[in-house]
């Protein structure tokens, strides 16, 4: 799962208490040059570094897991961030909100923290 840190920043503006991105248990967290929350919704493919290429498989529909802090094991008493996400990130008559995207490996390769990330969007 990949998500844009601008998306988490936008969500944190809506929450009574901010959360850390790790609460979503993603595989990749993108820090973009431009602040574009939820830009990852439109990505068709992602290239990390010079070799690894991923294709977008599906939006990441959120379950209750992000309500549990991975550092403490405690569940948020107000059911956040899921409760807040449901107010603005539900699509296609599905009650599960979306945050991030699932990726499938298209071409393997080595990746490391700080690699340049390229994204493709079909028009």
Per-segment meaning from a language model:
Residues 1-123:
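Metal-cofactor-dependent catalytic cores
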């Amino acid at each position: 799962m990949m998500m844009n840190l601008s998306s988490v920043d936008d969500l944190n503006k809506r929450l009574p208490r901010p959360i850390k991105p790790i609460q979503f248990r993603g595989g990749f967290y993108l820090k973009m040059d431009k602040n574009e929350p939820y830009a990852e919704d439109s990505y068709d493919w992602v290239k990390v570094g010079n070799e690894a290429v991923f294709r977008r498989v599906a939006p990441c529909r959120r379950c209750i897991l992000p309500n549990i802090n991975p550092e403490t094991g405690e569940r948020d008493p107000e059911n956040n961030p899921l409760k807040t996400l449901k107010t603005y990130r539900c699509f296609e008559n599905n009650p599960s909100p979306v945050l991030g995207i699932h990726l499938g490996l298209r071409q393997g390769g080595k990746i490391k923290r700080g690699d340049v990330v390229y994204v493709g969007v079909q028009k």
